Amino acid sequence: MKVLITGFDPFGGESINPALEAVKMIPENIEGAQVIKLEIPTVFRKSLEKIEEKIEEINPDVVISIGQAGGRFGVTPERVAINMDDARIEDNEGNQPIDISIYEDGESAYFSNLPIKAMVKEMVDNGIPASVSNTAGTFVCNHVMYGVLYLVNKKYKNIRAGFIHVPYIPAQVVNKPNTPSMAINDIAKGLELSIKAIVLNDNDIKTVGGAVC
């Protein structure tokens, strides 16, 4: 099995992106699966183009994209991506699409086909704070998740794909009072455990993972 895992470069004035740094730290072989790592730009369209180029090159079985979600307390596999770009800030090339469909011929939303609840359970069972997230936002993270799942539905039908958001690391919150963070080693371990769960679970488990609001 080949797993392509991507991480964004820093954005929004940050000098580091824990998503990318954690991706760099994970093993290149997990439960017999080959892990291929890819840095992508925090830029609308270009991020997707780079992922599709890599898909064409290596023909992966799984594509997982990792992004930073400052303010979250744990590692959060995403359930769904919506067909909407609505950028609160500019991307790294100054683009700021507002209320724009990602693909005009795409569905309103696509759901991850990764075993997200099994991933959360694997992390929690090993001491990593984790939960299912039901919103990937409307910035480049959602753009990438939606775009990859669009490609999976239209073109690469045998690929399993999804997205994981990770918290800030402590160095990023020194001047952000009362903002949660997680050690980079724990984030990397969470990603490794998530890949383990993907390799070992063709189908997701049935367990509570929803939210009241």
Swiss-Prot record:
Q: Which PROSITE patterns match?
A: PYRASE_CYS, PYRASE_GLU
Tagged with keyword Protease: yes
Coarsely, its chief localization is cytoplasm
- CDD domains in the cross-refs: Peptidase_C15
Q: What is the lineage of its organism?
A: Bacteria, Bacillati, Bacillota, Clostridia, Eubacteriales
Q: How does it assemble?
A: Homotetramer.
Which GO terms of type biological process are on file?
A: proteolysis
Q: Where in the cell is it found?
A: Cytoplasm
Keywords noted in UniProt:
Cytoplasm, Hydrolase, Protease, Thiol protease
Question: What organism is recorded for this protein?
Answer: Clostridium perfringens (strain 13 / Type A)
Q: What is its EC number?
A: 3.4.19.3
> Which InterPro entries does the record associate with it?
Peptidase_C15, Peptidase_C15-like, Peptidase_C15-like_sf, PGP-I_bact-type, PGPEP1_Cys_AS, PGPEP1_Glu_AS
- Name the residues annotated as catalytic in the UniProt entry: E78, C141, H165
State a single Gene Ontology molecular function: pyroglutamyl-peptidase activity
Provide the Gene Ontology terms for cellular component: cytosol
The answer to whether the entry has keyword DNA damage is no
- Name the enzyme's class: hydrolase
The disulfide bonds in this chain are none
Q: Give the protein family.
A: Belongs to the peptidase C15 family.
Q: Which reaction does it catalyse?
A: Release of an N-terminal pyroglutamyl group from a polypeptide, the second amino acid generally not being Pro
The UniProt function text for this chain reads: Removes 5-oxoproline from various penultimate amino acid residues except L-proline.
Q: Give the protein name, as stated in the record.
A: Pyrrolidone-carboxylate peptidase
